[in-house]
Amino acid sequence: MVAAAPSNKERLPDMMTSIRLDQSGRVEIIDQLLLPHSVVWMPVSTPEEAFDAIKTMRIRGAPAIASLAALTLRSYLSSSSSPVSSSSSSSDVISWVGQTIDYLQSSRPTAVNLGEAMDRIRAALKDSEAQNQTAGDIIQRVKKICGDVHDEDLERNMKMGRLGAEWLWKKRGGGKKGLKVMTVCNTGSLATSGYGTAIGVITALFQEDHLDTAYYAQTTPYHQGSRLTSLELTTLQIPACMICDTMLGSLFQHEDIDGVIVGADRVVKNGDTANKIGTYQAAVLAQRHNVPFMVVAPVTTIDLSLPTGAEIHIEHRPAAEATQVRGLDTETGKLSVVRITPEGVGEGDKPWQRVYNPSFDVTPAELISAVVTEKGVAERKEGEKSIDVASIC
Protein backbone atom coordinates (compact mmCIF):
# COMPACT_ATOMS: atom_id res chain seq x y z
CA MET A 1 0.00 0.00 0.00
CA VAL A 2 1.43 3.39 -1.04
CA ALA A 3 1.64 5.91 1.79
CA ALA A 4 -0.18 9.19 1.26
CA ALA A 5 2.02 12.14 0.37
CA PRO A 6 2.57 14.51 3.30
CA SER A 7 0.36 17.58 3.31
CA ASN A 8 1.76 21.09 3.15
CA LYS A 9 0.93 21.40 6.85
CA GLU A 10 3.09 18.38 7.69
CA ARG A 11 6.07 19.39 5.58
CA LEU A 12 6.20 23.13 6.29
CA PRO A 13 9.81 24.02 7.22
CA ASP A 14 10.65 25.96 10.37
CA MET A 15 9.83 29.65 10.17
CA MET A 16 12.35 32.42 10.66
CA THR A 17 12.24 34.67 13.69
CA SER A 18 13.32 38.27 14.15
CA ILE A 19 13.83 38.28 17.93
CA ARG A 20 15.27 35.79 20.37
CA LEU A 21 16.62 35.64 23.90
CA ASP A 22 20.05 34.20 24.61
CA GLN A 23 20.75 31.89 27.57
CA SER A 24 21.21 34.85 29.89
CA GLY A 25 17.91 36.42 28.82
CA ARG A 26 19.54 39.13 26.72
CA VAL A 27 17.60 40.26 23.66
CA GLU A 28 19.02 39.64 20.19
CA ILE A 29 17.61 40.58 16.79
CA ILE A 30 18.46 39.74 13.20
CA ASP A 31 19.97 42.81 11.54
CA GLN A 32 17.44 43.06 8.73
CA LEU A 33 19.56 45.59 6.85
CA LEU A 34 21.88 42.70 5.97
CA LEU A 35 19.16 40.30 4.80
CA PRO A 36 18.81 38.23 2.69
CA HIS A 37 22.52 37.77 2.02
CA SER A 38 23.74 37.59 5.59
CA VAL A 39 21.99 36.52 8.80
CA VAL A 40 23.63 38.35 11.68
CA TRP A 41 22.23 38.36 15.20
CA MET A 42 22.96 41.56 17.11
CA PRO A 43 22.48 42.14 20.84
CA VAL A 44 20.10 44.84 22.04
CA SER A 45 20.83 45.54 25.68
CA THR A 46 19.64 49.08 26.40
CA PRO A 47 16.66 51.30 25.53
CA GLU A 48 19.04 53.42 23.45
CA GLU A 49 20.09 50.40 21.40
CA ALA A 50 16.44 49.40 20.92
CA PHE A 51 15.58 52.94 19.79
CA ASP A 52 18.44 52.91 17.28
CA ALA A 53 17.53 49.44 15.94
CA ILE A 54 13.94 50.56 15.35
CA LYS A 55 14.83 53.99 13.94
CA THR A 56 17.39 52.60 11.49
CA MET A 57 15.03 49.74 10.53
CA ARG A 58 17.39 46.99 11.62
CA ILE A 59 14.08 45.63 12.84
CA ARG A 60 10.74 46.62 11.33
CA GLY A 61 7.12 45.58 11.30
CA ALA A 62 4.72 47.10 13.82
CA PRO A 63 4.32 43.99 16.04
CA ALA A 64 8.05 43.22 16.00
CA ILE A 65 9.15 46.68 17.07
CA ALA A 66 6.63 46.64 19.91
CA SER A 67 8.04 43.29 21.03
CA LEU A 68 11.61 44.55 20.82
CA ALA A 69 10.88 47.69 22.84
CA ALA A 70 9.05 45.68 25.50
CA LEU A 71 11.57 42.84 25.76
CA THR A 72 14.51 45.25 25.89
CA LEU A 73 12.87 47.20 28.71
CA ARG A 74 12.25 43.96 30.60
CA SER A 75 15.82 42.78 30.11
CA TYR A 76 17.30 46.16 31.08
CA LEU A 77 15.22 46.35 34.25
CA SER A 78 16.71 42.97 35.23
CA SER A 79 20.30 44.06 34.57
CA SER A 80 22.84 45.67 36.85
CA SER A 81 22.95 48.62 34.45
CA SER A 82 19.40 49.68 35.24
CA PRO A 83 19.26 53.02 37.08
CA VAL A 84 16.30 51.77 39.13
CA SER A 85 15.82 48.66 41.23
CA SER A 86 13.76 47.30 44.11
CA SER A 87 15.83 49.50 46.44
CA SER A 88 14.81 52.66 44.58
CA SER A 89 11.85 54.78 45.57
CA SER A 90 8.55 54.05 43.84
CA SER A 91 8.46 57.57 42.43
CA ASP A 92 11.91 57.14 40.87
CA VAL A 93 10.86 53.88 39.20
CA ILE A 94 7.65 55.41 37.85
CA SER A 95 9.51 58.48 36.60
CA TRP A 96 12.31 56.55 34.88
CA VAL A 97 10.05 53.95 33.27
CA GLY A 98 7.68 56.69 32.11
CA GLN A 99 10.47 58.67 30.46
CA THR A 100 11.91 55.52 28.88
CA ILE A 101 8.66 54.37 27.28
CA ASP A 102 8.07 57.88 25.91
CA TYR A 103 11.53 57.72 24.36
CA LEU A 104 10.99 54.26 22.88
CA GLN A 105 7.60 55.21 21.45
CA SER A 106 9.12 58.16 19.58
CA SER A 107 11.30 55.80 17.52
CA ARG A 108 8.47 54.90 15.09
CA PRO A 109 5.38 57.10 15.57
CA THR A 110 3.20 55.66 12.77
CA ALA A 111 3.17 52.11 14.17
CA VAL A 112 0.32 51.95 16.67
CA ASN A 113 1.39 48.61 18.20
CA LEU A 114 4.37 50.26 19.84
CA GLY A 115 2.17 52.98 21.30
CA GLU A 116 -0.38 50.42 22.51
CA ALA A 117 2.34 48.43 24.29
CA MET A 118 3.73 51.54 25.94
CA ASP A 119 0.21 52.64 26.92
CA ARG A 120 -0.29 49.34 28.75
CA ILE A 121 2.79 50.13 30.79
CA ARG A 122 1.62 53.71 31.41
CA ALA A 123 -1.70 52.45 32.72
CA ALA A 124 0.10 50.04 35.04
CA LEU A 125 2.34 52.83 36.35
CA LYS A 126 -0.67 55.01 37.07
CA ASP A 127 -2.45 52.18 38.87
CA SER A 128 0.68 51.24 40.83
CA GLU A 129 1.06 54.83 41.98
CA ALA A 130 -2.58 54.92 43.11
CA GLN A 131 -2.06 51.70 45.08
CA ASN A 132 1.22 52.90 46.62
CA GLN A 133 3.01 49.78 45.40
CA THR A 134 6.65 49.21 46.25
CA ALA A 135 9.41 49.77 43.71
CA GLY A 136 10.00 46.03 43.46
CA ASP A 137 6.33 45.31 42.80
CA ILE A 138 6.17 48.01 40.13
CA ILE A 139 9.23 46.64 38.35
CA GLN A 140 7.82 43.11 38.38
CA ARG A 141 4.50 44.36 37.05
CA VAL A 142 6.17 46.23 34.19
CA LYS A 143 8.32 43.21 33.33
CA LYS A 144 5.23 40.97 33.23
CA ILE A 145 3.49 43.30 30.77
CA CYS A 146 6.61 43.44 28.60
CA GLY A 147 6.70 39.66 28.35
CA ASP A 148 2.98 39.52 27.55
CA VAL A 149 3.40 41.97 24.65
CA HIS A 150 5.73 39.50 22.96
CA ASP A 151 4.03 36.24 23.90
CA GLU A 152 0.52 37.28 22.87
CA ASP A 153 1.59 38.16 19.34
CA LEU A 154 2.28 34.64 18.05
CA GLU A 155 -1.04 33.18 19.24
CA ARG A 156 -3.14 35.93 17.70
CA ASN A 157 -1.21 35.77 14.42
CA MET A 158 -2.14 32.12 14.00
CA LYS A 159 -5.80 32.96 14.68
CA MET A 160 -5.76 35.74 12.09
CA GLY A 161 -4.10 33.47 9.55
CA ARG A 162 -6.87 30.91 9.90
CA LEU A 163 -9.70 33.47 9.85
CA GLY A 164 -8.32 35.30 6.83
CA ALA A 165 -7.70 32.12 4.87
CA GLU A 166 -11.21 30.82 5.59
CA TRP A 167 -12.79 34.13 4.55
CA LEU A 168 -10.91 34.37 1.25
CA TRP A 169 -11.40 30.71 0.35
CA LYS A 170 -15.14 31.10 0.94
CA LYS A 171 -15.16 34.18 -1.31
CA ARG A 172 -13.03 32.89 -4.18
CA GLY A 173 -12.33 29.20 -3.73
CA GLY A 174 -15.32 27.75 -5.53
CA GLY A 175 -14.21 25.35 -8.25
CA LYS A 176 -10.52 26.15 -7.79
CA LYS A 177 -7.62 24.01 -6.67
CA GLY A 178 -5.78 26.98 -5.22
CA LEU A 179 -5.88 30.76 -5.01
CA LYS A 180 -3.57 33.33 -6.54
CA VAL A 181 -2.93 36.11 -4.06
CA MET A 182 -0.75 39.18 -3.92
CA THR A 183 0.90 41.00 -1.02
CA VAL A 184 2.98 44.09 -0.28
CA CYS A 185 5.96 44.66 2.02
CA ASN A 186 6.92 42.01 4.60
CA THR A 187 4.38 40.81 7.14
CA GLY A 188 5.74 37.45 8.23
CA SER A 189 7.85 36.20 11.12
CA LEU A 190 10.47 38.89 10.48
CA ALA A 191 7.84 41.59 11.08
CA THR A 192 6.14 39.98 14.08
CA SER A 193 6.83 37.61 16.95
CA GLY A 194 6.06 34.70 14.63
CA TYR A 195 3.82 33.39 11.80
CA GLY A 196 2.93 36.86 10.58
CA THR A 197 -0.20 38.78 9.66
CA ALA A 198 -0.77 38.89 5.89
CA ILE A 199 1.88 36.23 5.31
CA GLY A 200 0.16 34.28 8.08
CA VAL A 201 -2.95 34.12 5.88
CA ILE A 202 -0.84 33.04 2.91
CA THR A 203 0.82 30.37 5.06
CA ALA A 204 -2.57 29.13 6.29
CA LEU A 205 -3.83 28.88 2.70
CA PHE A 206 -0.72 26.90 1.79
CA GLN A 207 -1.08 24.58 4.78
CA GLU A 208 -4.65 23.79 3.74
CA ASP A 209 -3.58 23.16 0.11
CA HIS A 210 -5.62 26.18 -0.97
CA LEU A 211 -2.76 28.24 -2.44
CA ASP A 212 -1.68 28.36 -6.07
CA THR A 213 0.80 31.26 -6.03
CA ALA A 214 1.69 34.14 -3.72
CA TYR A 215 2.84 37.19 -5.68
CA TYR A 216 4.79 39.75 -3.68
CA ALA A 217 5.82 43.28 -4.64
CA GLN A 218 9.45 44.35 -4.29
CA THR A 219 8.26 47.27 -2.14
CA THR A 220 10.89 49.83 -2.95
CA PRO A 221 12.77 51.83 -1.88
CA TYR A 222 13.56 49.60 1.10
CA HIS A 223 12.88 46.36 -0.76
CA GLN A 224 11.05 44.65 2.10
CA GLY A 225 9.43 42.40 -0.47
CA SER A 226 12.46 41.42 -2.52
CA ARG A 227 14.77 41.15 0.51
CA LEU A 228 12.56 39.84 3.30
CA THR A 229 9.31 38.37 2.00
CA SER A 230 11.30 36.51 -0.64
CA LEU A 231 13.52 35.06 2.08
CA GLU A 232 10.57 33.96 4.21
CA LEU A 233 8.58 32.40 1.38
CA THR A 234 11.59 30.55 -0.02
CA THR A 235 12.46 29.34 3.49
CA LEU A 236 8.90 28.02 3.86
CA GLN A 237 8.97 26.65 0.28
CA ILE A 238 5.69 28.37 -0.52
CA PRO A 239 4.97 28.81 -4.27
CA ALA A 240 5.72 32.47 -4.86
CA CYS A 241 6.61 34.99 -7.54
CA MET A 242 8.24 38.41 -7.10
CA ILE A 243 6.97 41.37 -9.10
CA CYS A 244 8.31 44.90 -9.41
CA ASP A 245 6.11 47.62 -7.94
CA THR A 246 5.48 49.02 -11.43
CA MET A 247 4.14 45.65 -12.62
CA LEU A 248 1.05 45.47 -10.42
CA GLY A 249 -1.26 46.68 -13.18
CA SER A 250 0.10 44.13 -15.62
CA LEU A 251 -0.31 41.37 -13.03
CA PHE A 252 -4.00 42.17 -12.57
CA GLN A 253 -4.50 42.32 -16.33
CA HIS A 254 -2.87 38.99 -17.13
CA GLU A 255 -3.39 36.80 -14.04
CA ASP A 256 -6.62 35.81 -12.31
CA ILE A 257 -5.76 37.26 -8.90
CA ASP A 258 -8.10 36.11 -6.15
CA GLY A 259 -7.11 38.49 -3.39
CA VAL A 260 -4.72 41.15 -2.15
CA ILE A 261 -3.61 40.51 1.43
CA VAL A 262 -1.74 43.22 3.35
CA GLY A 263 -0.78 44.03 6.91
CA ALA A 264 -1.16 47.39 8.63
CA ASP A 265 0.70 49.82 10.82
CA ARG A 266 -2.49 51.60 11.89
CA VAL A 267 -6.19 51.05 11.24
CA VAL A 268 -8.44 53.89 12.40
CA LYS A 269 -12.10 53.98 13.44
CA ASN A 270 -13.63 54.15 9.95
CA GLY A 271 -11.34 51.44 8.56
CA ASP A 272 -8.84 53.69 6.78
CA THR A 273 -5.50 51.90 6.92
CA ALA A 274 -1.91 53.12 7.01
CA ASN A 275 0.52 50.56 5.66
CA LYS A 276 3.79 50.39 3.78
CA ILE A 277 4.06 52.69 0.79
CA GLY A 278 2.58 51.01 -2.28
CA THR A 279 -0.44 49.57 -0.49
CA TYR A 280 -2.81 52.27 -1.74
CA GLN A 281 -1.96 51.70 -5.39
CA ALA A 282 -2.53 47.96 -4.94
CA ALA A 283 -5.96 48.73 -3.45
CA VAL A 284 -6.90 50.98 -6.37
CA LEU A 285 -5.96 48.26 -8.86
CA ALA A 286 -7.75 45.59 -6.84
CA GLN A 287 -10.99 47.55 -6.91
CA ARG A 288 -10.64 48.21 -10.64
CA HIS A 289 -10.34 44.46 -11.24
CA ASN A 290 -12.96 43.40 -8.65
CA VAL A 291 -10.40 41.62 -6.49
CA PRO A 292 -11.02 41.33 -2.71
CA PHE A 293 -8.61 43.49 -0.69
CA MET A 294 -7.97 42.23 2.84
CA VAL A 295 -6.19 43.98 5.73
CA VAL A 296 -4.83 41.66 8.41
CA ALA A 297 -3.78 43.20 11.72
CA PRO A 298 -4.08 42.49 15.44
CA VAL A 299 -6.46 44.43 17.65
CA THR A 300 -3.45 46.35 18.96
CA THR A 301 -3.07 47.93 15.51
CA ILE A 302 -6.58 49.40 15.54
CA ASP A 303 -6.72 52.98 16.77
CA LEU A 304 -10.30 53.98 17.56
CA SER A 305 -9.14 57.39 18.80
CA LEU A 306 -8.68 58.62 15.23
CA PRO A 307 -11.87 59.01 13.17
CA THR A 308 -10.26 58.85 9.72
CA GLY A 309 -6.93 58.26 8.03
CA ALA A 310 -6.48 61.99 7.52
CA GLU A 311 -5.31 62.20 11.14
CA ILE A 312 -2.57 59.55 10.77
CA HIS A 313 0.96 60.90 11.06
CA ILE A 314 2.99 59.69 8.07
CA GLU A 315 6.70 59.20 8.63
CA HIS A 316 9.07 60.36 5.90
CA ARG A 317 12.37 58.52 5.54
CA PRO A 318 15.83 59.87 4.58
CA ALA A 319 16.36 60.57 0.89
CA ALA A 320 19.38 58.27 0.83
CA GLU A 321 17.08 55.27 1.23
CA ALA A 322 15.61 56.10 -2.18
CA THR A 323 18.78 57.22 -3.96
CA GLN A 324 20.96 54.31 -2.84
CA VAL A 325 20.53 50.55 -2.79
CA ARG A 326 22.28 47.90 -0.71
CA GLY A 327 23.03 44.50 -2.18
CA LEU A 328 25.51 41.74 -2.85
CA ASP A 329 28.25 42.46 -5.36
CA THR A 330 28.06 39.38 -7.58
CA GLU A 331 31.73 39.74 -8.57
CA THR A 332 33.30 40.21 -5.13
CA GLY A 333 30.65 38.46 -3.03
CA LYS A 334 30.63 41.41 -0.63
CA LEU A 335 27.74 43.57 0.52
CA SER A 336 27.91 47.10 -0.82
CA VAL A 337 25.84 50.26 -1.16
CA VAL A 338 25.60 51.96 -4.54
CA ARG A 339 24.02 55.18 -5.72
CA ILE A 340 21.35 54.84 -8.42
CA THR A 341 20.70 58.56 -8.98
CA PRO A 342 22.91 61.42 -10.20
CA GLU A 343 25.15 62.93 -7.55
CA GLY A 344 23.38 65.60 -5.52
CA VAL A 345 19.86 64.22 -5.76
CA GLY A 346 18.48 64.11 -2.24
CA GLU A 347 21.54 65.87 -0.82
CA GLY A 348 21.00 69.54 -1.57
CA ASP A 349 18.28 72.15 -1.22
CA LYS A 350 17.89 73.01 -4.89
CA PRO A 351 14.42 72.55 -6.42
CA TRP A 352 15.79 69.82 -8.73
CA GLN A 353 17.41 67.83 -5.90
CA ARG A 354 14.31 66.87 -3.96
CA VAL A 355 13.20 63.34 -3.06
CA TYR A 356 9.69 62.41 -1.89
CA ASN A 357 10.04 59.37 0.37
CA PRO A 358 7.07 58.68 2.66
CA SER A 359 7.32 55.37 4.47
CA PHE A 360 3.56 54.75 4.48
CA ASP A 361 0.41 55.60 2.57
CA VAL A 362 -3.23 55.50 3.67
CA THR A 363 -5.75 53.26 1.93
CA PRO A 364 -9.35 54.54 2.32
CA ALA A 365 -11.80 52.05 3.80
CA GLU A 366 -13.95 52.27 0.66
CA LEU A 367 -11.18 50.35 -1.17
CA ILE A 368 -10.93 47.63 1.50
CA SER A 369 -13.10 44.52 1.37
CA ALA A 370 -12.44 43.25 4.89
CA VAL A 371 -10.33 43.80 7.99
CA VAL A 372 -9.23 40.71 9.91
CA THR A 373 -8.12 40.67 13.55
CA GLU A 374 -7.77 37.82 16.01
CA LYS A 375 -11.35 38.61 17.11
CA GLY A 376 -12.98 38.14 13.70
CA VAL A 377 -13.59 39.56 10.23
CA ALA A 378 -15.28 42.91 9.56
CA GLU A 379 -16.51 43.24 5.97
CA ARG A 380 -17.30 46.50 4.24
CA LYS A 381 -20.96 46.49 3.31
CA GLU A 382 -21.93 47.10 -0.31
CA GLY A 383 -22.11 50.82 -1.02
CA GLU A 384 -20.57 51.81 2.32
CA LYS A 385 -17.40 53.90 2.60
CA SER A 386 -16.38 52.73 6.07
CA ILE A 387 -15.86 49.49 7.98
CA ASP A 388 -17.02 48.79 11.53
CA VAL A 389 -13.63 47.79 12.89
CA ALA A 390 -14.84 48.39 16.46
CA SER A 391 -16.85 45.17 16.10
CA ILE A 392 -13.64 43.12 15.92
CA CYS A 393 -11.74 44.79 18.76
Curated annotation (Swiss-Prot):
Keywords: Amino-acid biosynthesis, Cytoplasm, Isomerase, Methionine biosynthesis, Nucleus. It catalyses: 5-(methylsulfanyl)-alpha-D-ribose 1-phosphate = 5-(methylsulfanyl)-D-ribulose 1-phosphate. GO terms for biological process: L-methionine salvage from methylthioadenosine. Its EC number is 5.3.1.23. Its main location: cytoplasm. The active site is at residue 265. InterPro entries: IF-2B-related (IPR000649), IF-M1Pi (IPR005251), IF_2B-like_C (IPR042529), Initiation_fac_2B_a/b/d (IPR011559), M1Pi_N (IPR027363), NagB/RpiA_transferase-like (IPR037171). The record marks 185 as: Transition state stabilizer. The keyword Kinase does not apply. It is found in: Cytoplasm; Nucleus. Coiled coil: none annotated. It comes from the Eukaryota. Belongs to the eIF-2B alpha/beta/delta subunits family. MtnA subfamily. Catalyzes the interconversion of methylthioribose-1-phosphate (MTR-1-P) into methylthioribulose-1-phosphate (MTRu-1-P). This is Methylthioribose-1-phosphate isomerase. It comes from Cryptococcus neoformans var. neoformans serotype D (strain JEC21 / ATCC MYA-565) (Filobasidiella neoformans).
